[in-house]
UniProtKB/Swiss-Prot annotation:
Cellular component aspect of the GO annotation: chloroplast thylakoid membrane
NCBIfam families documented for this protein: NDH_I_N (TIGR01770), PRK02504.1 (NF002701)
Listed name of the protein: NAD(P)H-quinone oxidoreductase subunit 2 A, chloroplastic
A Pfam family annotated for this UniProt entry: Ndh2_N
Molecular function terms from GO: NADH dehydrogenase (ubiquinone) activity; quinone binding
Keywords attached to this entry: Chloroplast, Membrane, NAD, NADP, Plastid, Plastoquinone, Quinone, Thylakoid, Translocase, Transmembrane, Transmembrane helix, Transport
Length: 510
């Protein structure tokens, strides 16, 4: 009799939970429609992989790319709608979150064509690769709209788990296994630090988990200036710092960049920074509203260290991927300036604009590296010597992307940095802007050093890799070159296109 009653109670409780979940999905599901499209694409990929004996590679890529494009389209149709909070306060949709979701979808859409020939040449499992990329994209999108501490913790873990698997995807490569182990250990440590910071925030606010409710809780408990909030700020900054990889939280970046497959590095180098930047702006701006001076100081220190160390160490690198790793550390220092400025003086707008240009510049550079690596089998900088004599198109594309990363006019990177530094100067961050200008000059030096190698015609400097260079006859090259062309064009657009981009970015302020 007792067992029968307990069984009935269990069934009733399960039914209530199911009905509540169904109610949430029915009434709030439209607010995560872009994410649902990607989930449907994931299910479709799994069904095809489990029912088909022979893998139809073009069809798998078509499904992945189509789901991403459809998700972008649904996101654009929702633009300028009223901000809404759904799923019992766990998720928020507004223009600010959606622009970051758009950037993540754009990254994934451009990264998938980069991986076509690479996966074929390395004989990697195609379906699993696409599943991990789409799942990481979903995790990044949920992180952009996360409105409570639990979702802010779970969403990046979804992204991180897929990132660990992608970085170790070439299991026979010792460097890839080493990169995965370092990435996993550092990621686990940072997650524990982050959740410890959340526990301090949760306790200080009186048990609140929603971001705005945490602010109200801190006011009610009079704990907004307590030592507990300072401890929470330090731990959360360290935890988020791992995702952004500024100095001194950058130790994992060079090894993971060098050991991971190049298309994976291209994906991680942009999506992780976009998602982490979106999360950082909301966490610092809302729960730590009363501690703005403290987190401004912390981020200023991180920005200075990142810009100086990242660009100085990049000069000494001999591997193209390690050089780009340290370059990305310097680039995130520039992005942090926009986070510090905030919604005043167009700080967020300048950060979004620069990140859009950074996506095109960085992915364009990695597209060139993928092509060169597949045709020569090397990633050393010195092996690029004389590439212009064999493949002028690839050499010029790489040169334009590198010059744009350095911020030379009239390329897109120059106008992005100009807008970012101008907003920082208007906000009174004179020292940060001066450091940014000086380190930008340093970055131009090592970018020009590579371009000089590309254009050299001396036979004694040209390595056997370039002497024996042959353009691959495979048709799949067209997808990599298509992504490269799109990124190069976006990296070289003139300043005349800046006004509409800035106007769109300014509309995202919450």
């Amino acid at each position: 009799m007792i067992w029968h009653v307990q069984n009935e109670n269990f069934i009733l409780d399960s039914t209530r939970i199911f009905m509540k979940a169904f109610h949430l999905l029915l009434f709030d599901g439209s607010l995560i429609f872009p994410e649902c499209i990607l989930i449907f694409g994931l299910i479709l990929l799994l069904m095809i992989d489990s029912t088909s004996d022979q893998k139809d590679i073009p069809w798998l890529y078509f499904i992945s790319s189509t789901s991403l494009v459809m998700s972008i389209t649904s996101l654009l149709f929702r633009w300028r709608e009223e901000p809404m909070i759904s799923f019992s306060g766990n998720f928020q949709t507004n223009n600010f979150n959606e622009i970051f979701q758009f950037l993540i979808l754009l990254c994934s859409t451009l990264c998938i064509p980069l991986s076509v020939e690479y996966i074929e040449c390395t004989e990697m499992a195609i379906t699993e690769f696409l599943l991990f990329v789409l799942t990481a994209t979903i995790g990044g999108m949920f992180l952009c709209g996360a409105n409570d501490l639990i979702t802010i913790f779970v969403a990046p873990e979804c992204f991180s788990l897929c990132s660990y698997l992608l970085s170790g995807y070439t299991k026979k490569d010792v460097r890839s296994n080493e990169a995965t182990m370092k990435y996993l250990l550092m990621g686990g440590a940072s997650s524990s630090i982050l959740v410890h910071g959340f526990s301090w925030l949760y306790g200080s606010s009186g048990g609140e988990i929603e971001l705005q409710e945490i602010v109200n809780g801190l006011i009610n408990t009079q704990m907004y200036n307590s030592p507990g909030i300072s401890i929470a700020l330090i731990f959360i900054t360290v935890g988020i710092g791992f995702k952004l990889s500024p100095a001194p939280s950058h130790q994992w970046t060079p090894d993971v960049y060098e050991g991971s497959p190049t298309p994976v590095v291209a994906f991680l180098s942009v999506t992780s920074k976009v998602a982490a930047s979106a999360s950082a702006t909301r966490i610092f701006d809302i729960p730590f509203y009363f501690s703005s001076n403290e987190w401004h100081l912390l981020l200023e220190i991180l920005a200075i260290l990142s810009m100086i160390l990242g660009n100085l160490i990049a000069i000494t690198q001999t591997s193209m991927k390690r050089m780009l790793a340290y370059s990305s550390i310097g680039q995130i220092g520039y992005v942090i300036i926009g986070i510090i400025v905030g919604d005043s003086n167009d700080g967020y707008a300048s950060m979004i604009t620069y990140m859009l240009f950074y996506i095109s510049m960085n992915l364009g550079t990695f597209a060139c590296i993928v092509l060169f690596g597949l045709r020569t089998g090397t990633e050393n900088i010195r092996d690029y010597a004389g590439l212009y004599t064999k493949d002028p198109f690839l050499a010029l594309s790489l040169a334009l992307c590198l010059l744009s990363l350095g911020g030379l006019p009239p390329l897109a990177g120059f106008f992005g940095k100009l807008y970012l530094f101008w907003c920082g100067w208007q906000a009174g961050l004179y020292f940060l802007v001066l450091i940014g200008l000086l380190t930008s000059v340093v970055s131009i030096y090592y970018y020009l050093k590579i371009i000089k190698l590309l254009m050299t015609g001396r036979n004694q400097e040209i390595t056997p890799h370039v002497r024996n260079y042959r353009r691959s006859p495979l048709r799949s090259n067209n997808s990599i070159e298509l992504s490269m062309i799109v990124c190069v064009i976006a990296s070289t657009i003139p300043g005349i296109s800046m006004n509409p981009i800035i106007a769109i970015a300014q509309d995202t302020l919450f």
